[in-house]
Design a protein with these regions (language model features):
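A conserved active-site cap/scaffold subdomain adjacent to cofactor or substrate pockets
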Residues: 4-12
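Structural signal for well-ordered, non-membrane alpha-helices
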Residues: 13, 17-24, 61-64, 90-97, ...
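Helix-adjacent hinge/juxtasegments
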Residues: 61, 65-103
Length: 168
């Protein structure tokens, strides 16, 4: 579970952070304020780019904390610039990567309660597989789609990030 919760999820956040540089390049080439992308959305009733980043970060830090027996750090949802978005991603990754594999011992059996489901809990493995991973990918995909919709030149390899090939 440690690999899926920490290594894979933090890599996706690092990929997302790398897209910010391309967003800045795109805005510079098209001569508009890159900050406009923070409020970008695909549909009028959809949450904006910044919400997608905040949510992905929140799911990663919650899984890192709850599945290792800790309380997640609180991050204010007040980012307004690309640099602040980048900082949010970096502090989330730093926290998640500070959790050791040893702290994840027993993670599958830990009980996770969610404020919107009073009186119910999820086992750690179900929480990771049914809540964390799908939500991290959902929000990162939405952030990707918003940037692409606004012309930022990112592609599938940017989404996938580094691939750890081994010799055949």
């Amino acid at each position: 579970m440690y690999y899926q919760a920490i290594s894979q999820c933090t890599q996706m956040l690092k990929n997302l952070e790398s897209w910010l540089h391309k967003a800045e390049q795109h805005a510079g080439a098209k001569t508009f304020d890159v900050g406009v992308l923070i409020t970008g959305r695909l549909a009028p009733d959809m949450k904006p780019f910044i919400y997608q980043v905040q949510s992905a970060c929140d799911y990663v830090k919650a899984a890192a904390a709850w599945l290792s027996g800790q309380t997640p750090p609180k991050h204010e949802d007040n980012e307004q610039t690309i640099d602040e978005v980048r900082a949010r991603i970096r502090k989330t990754v730093a926290f998640a990567e500070s959790v050791t594999e040893a702290q994840y011992a027993g993670a599958a059996e830990r009980k996770v309660s969610l404020s919107w489901a009073p009186g119910k809990v999820l086992g750690g493995e179900d929480y990771l597989l049914q809540m964390t991973i799908p939500n991290v990918y959902f929000h990162i995909v939405m952030a990707y789609a918003i940037l692409r919709h606004n012309g930022v030149e990112i592609g599938k390899m940017d989404f996938l990030g580094p691939i750890h090939w081994i010799e055949a």
